[in-house]
């Protein structure tokens, strides 16, 4: 079963105006999680909504934006932090202080999702960034800097939950509802919902990789 089918009912139900008017905060998150698990229990069929709501994005890494220690594979589907700066052009699109890289395609409308495989390493984040995200100088991974993300960390206060530590590899799925202003993460069945004000700006996949981390888009 594809992630799109697994979330069809849950996301459609939660994002109707009638429900959004009534549900806020923890209630919103709780109901979303219950719907997700109910859908999984029924094989993703009993609660499935009409097809075509969520479009799968074939995401690749943009090497022109990659920090100097991040090496992008020839097929642009894998990126690894090799820990040693590489000789790369200091073009305007490139992050020069934070180990980050952007992906494509970008999104200006609609509902989309993409999947990323991660290993046993910590200190990584996956999400979305505005096209205008700062490339030069220190970067904080917060909405105020046009970044919406989650991931696994040893410790990073204020930017994500430092308690989410897993010892195994896995997959994270990122859902973006552009018009609804929602970014939704499924990380090992932990559902995180972030409200986002995209302000009409194109948003693109965003990745942060600490030392020795490798990520692969699926």
UniProtKB/Swiss-Prot annotation:
Organism superkingdom: Eukaryota
Signal keyword on record: yes
InterPro entries: B30.2/SPRY, B30.2/SPRY_sf, Butyrophylin_SPRY, ConA-like_dom_sf, PRY, SPRY_dom, TRIM/RBCC
Signal peptide stretch: 1-40
Keyword Nucleotidyltransferase: no
Pfam families in the cross-refs: PRY, SPRY
Subcellular location(s) of the protein: Secreted
Tissue: Expressed by the venom gland.
Domain B30.2/SPRY: 49-155
Role description: Neurotoxin that produces dose-dependent hypolocomotion and hyperalgesia in mice. May directly act on the central nervous system, as it is 6500-fold more potent when administered intracerebroventricularly than intraperitoneal.
Family designation: Belongs to the ohanin/vespryn family.
The protein's name: Ohanin-like protein
Organism: Lachesis muta muta
